[in-house]
Design a protein with these regions (language model features):
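Glycine-rich, proline-tolerant flexible connector loops at the mouths of alpha/beta enzymes
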Residues: 46-78, 130-133
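N-terminal amphipathic alpha-helix/helix-capping segment at the start of soluble metabolic enzymes
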Residues: 1-23, 84-85, 89
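Glycine/small-residue-rich loop that forms an oxyanion/phosphate-binding "nest" at active or ligand-binding sites
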Residues: 62-114, 118-120
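Catalytic cores of alpha/beta
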Residues: 31-43, 155-165
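Conserved, mostly hydrophobic/aromatic
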Residues: 24, 40, 48-51, 115, ...
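Active-site rim beta-loop-alpha module in soluble metabolic enzymes
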Residues: 165-173
Length: 173
C-alpha cells in the first residue's frame, strides 16, 4: 500500500466523516490574491489551489485564461507567486496548478523543492500525461509535494490513476 501524504490524509479524513470539501481556486499574481486566500482560509476552506500564471494555459477555460494573462500583465511569474505564497501561513494545505513547461524549464527536482520551500503541499500539472509523470512524481515525492492527477469520468480502469499518484485525485465533469 502506498503512503498517504498529509494533504491526501487530511482530505480523506474529512470526506470519510461525511464532509464535503471546499477547495477554491485563486490565480496567483492577481490584485488581492493573497487577501483572497487568507479570507478563504479564515472562512472554512479546506485547502486552496493557486494557479501559477502561464502564457498559454490551453487546458483552462476562458475565465482562467484571462486571469492568468492579467496576472502576467501585472508582472507575476511562478517565482514571485511562490515567494508570496511562502509568506501566507494560513493553516490549511495549499496546492498549485501549473503547466508542465514551468516544471520542465525549472527542472523537476528544483521546481519540487521550490514548491516545498514555499509551503506548497501538492501540485496539479494537467498537461503531464500519467504515462510520462514518473520523473516529476519522483522528484515531487522526494521534496514532500504530492502529485494530484486529474481524470475524466470516462477514463478507463487500466489507466489506474488512483494508484499512480499521491495527493487527491480530481475527477473532471
Amino acid at each position: 500500500m502506498r503512503h498517504l501524504g498529509a494533504l491526501e490524509a487530511s482530505f480523506r479524513a474529512k470526506r470519510d466523516s461525511g464532509r464535503k470539501l471546499l477547495v477554491p481556486y485563486v490565480t496567483g499574481g492577481l490584485e488581492g490574491w493573497e487577501d483572497a486566500i487568507r479570507a478563504a482560509a479564515a472562512h472554512g476552506a479546506d485547502g486552496i489551489e493557486i494557479g501559477l500564471p502561464f502564457s498559454d494555459p490551453a487546458m483552462d477555460g476562458p475565465v482562467l485564461q484571462e486571469a492568468s494573462q492579467r496576472a502576467l500583465d501585472a508582472g507575476a511569474t511562478p517565482v514571485t507567486v511562490l515567494d508570496a505564497a511562502s509568506r501566507l501561513d494560513v493553516g490549511i494545505p495549499l496546492a498549485v496548478m501549473c503547466y508542465y513547461n514551468t516544471v520542465f524549464r525549472a527542472g523537476h527536482e528544483r521546481f519540487a523543492q521550490r514548491l516545498s520551500n514555499a509551503g506548497i503541499s501538492g501540485a496539479i500539472v494537467p498537461d503531464l500525461p500519467l504515462e510520462e509523470s514518473g520523473p516529476w512524481a519522483t522528484a515531487a515525492d522526494a521534496a514532500g509535494v504530492e502529485t494530484i492527477m486529474l481524470a475524466a469520468p470516462t477514463a478507463p480502469d487500466e489507466r489506474q490513476v488512483g494508484n499512480d499518484c499521491t495527493g487527491d485525485t480530481g475527477i473532471g465533469e
